[in-house]
Amino acid sequence: MGARFSPEIASGCVLALMLLGGVPPTSAHEPVLLDPNRATPGVRLELVEVPLATTGSEAPGYRLAVAGLPTGVVFSVWTKHFGHSFHEELHSGFRVDETGKLVLVQRGGVDGPRYLDQMVFQPEAYPRGANWQVAVASADRTITGFATVIPRPIVARDGPCAVSLELVSHRGLRFLASGSGFAAGEDVVVESRYSGRVSRKQQRVSAAGLLPKEVVSHAAVSDDRDARFSVKGRSCEVTLDYEWGNAALRGH
């Protein structure tokens, strides 16, 4: 599962990262070159979504906005795909110019300079609900910055209410549920269904209208990998249909 890179396209939740925990089985033998928990203070990265001619099964494209990097240092751009460590260097040779932008000077200078904020990065086939990370790092990796997005979110809305699930298991067994837009302090009914099992409980919404975050876990009891998560309040009812297990890991 790589990333596209061309003149136009280069193919990324603290609690979620804690739930993933350490080095996943799929990357057990990959060196840990960059650690998001050790980002350089003052360095800021943001992935800004841009419209692309994609289908619903494809991830969107992003431009990378960077601030706080020093001059006189060479930087590289890295990506981290779900289930792996940072090991894919997309491009190197960026420097901060007099305007504060990262610029890549082509060999020979035939095509002129290329600015990082004009490039578009796009992960290839990617699981729903999984996060994608991009990093900018100095050549010696002492200066680093990170940005995280969920290219294909699992989210549903009803009026002002929204509920989302983030994939936090490399086996597709756990999802982090969160919600917003509910009536402050109201009691809502949270229901999880999969493989004939039903779990139902009451949760209290915060004063800010947020649903308490919780981990939704799954265990194999049949071949059915379809699941449903719903939250019902006084004025809205939000339902999410999704897949879990190996079916959740497919980038389709």
Please identify what each model-predicted range represents.
Residues 2-13:
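Bacterial N-terminal signal peptides that target proteins for export
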Residues 5, 19-21, 187-189:
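Ubiquitous "structural anchor" signal
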Residues 11-21:
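Bacterial N-terminal signal peptides
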Residues 27-252:
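Extracytoplasmic/secretory-pathway segments with low complexity and glycosylation-like composition
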